[in-house]
Amino acid sequence: MSNSSKKHLDLPYRPGVGMMILNADNHIFVGKRIDTKISAWQMPQGGIVPGETPSIAAMREMLEEIGSDKGYIIAESKCWYSYDVPSFLIPKLWNGNFRGQKQRWFLIRFTGNNEDININTSNPEFDQWRWASLDELLSIIIPFKRKLYQAVVKEFESLIQ
């Protein structure tokens, strides 16, 4: 293990939230990240502001990332899930202060329509978006988040059927 890898393992996780947003057909909102050349699709996620509860952060992040907060929380994950970003990304993300994120996940029912979604926000994270089926979700997600997504799907799957 290199010194830089060991140093990265000593970094904390950034506290955040993730949102599995369902439409009326139980398809899941995914966005293609704007900051990479590869096809990196993900569900919306973001940080928790100090003093903010995870559920408040989830609804704020939903509005910030998809331009709408039309929806309600169905469920909150029972635990915090974490993932590490590849070491080459650490200096580029969060000023190099975190090795990845620990997240509380929320299953959210979107009550708006497609026209309510606007990814061209003041700080856009996505350049494309679509609704994905539960079956295809894991195959389109960026690989370093796949294990976390598998755990989230397993926890929420019975509520999606």
From Swiss-Prot:
Enzyme's top EC category: hydrolase
InterPro entries: NUDIX_hydrolase-like_dom_sf, NUDIX_hydrolase_CS, NUDIX_hydrolase_dom, RppH
Role noted for this protein: Accelerates the degradation of transcripts by removing pyrophosphate from the 5'-end of triphosphorylated RNA, leading to a more labile monophosphorylated state that can stimulate subsequent ribonuclease cleavage.
Cellular compartments per GO CC: cytoplasm
Record's keyword terms, sorted: Hydrolase
GO biological process: mRNA catabolic process
Family matches, as Pfam families: NUDIX (PF00293)
Signal peptide coordinates: none
Family: Belongs to the Nudix hydrolase family. RppH subfamily.
Motif (Nudix box): 46-67
Record bears the keyword Nucleotide-binding: no
Span of domain Nudix hydrolase: 12-154
Protein name: RNA pyrophosphohydrolase
Superkingdom of this protein's organism: Bacteria
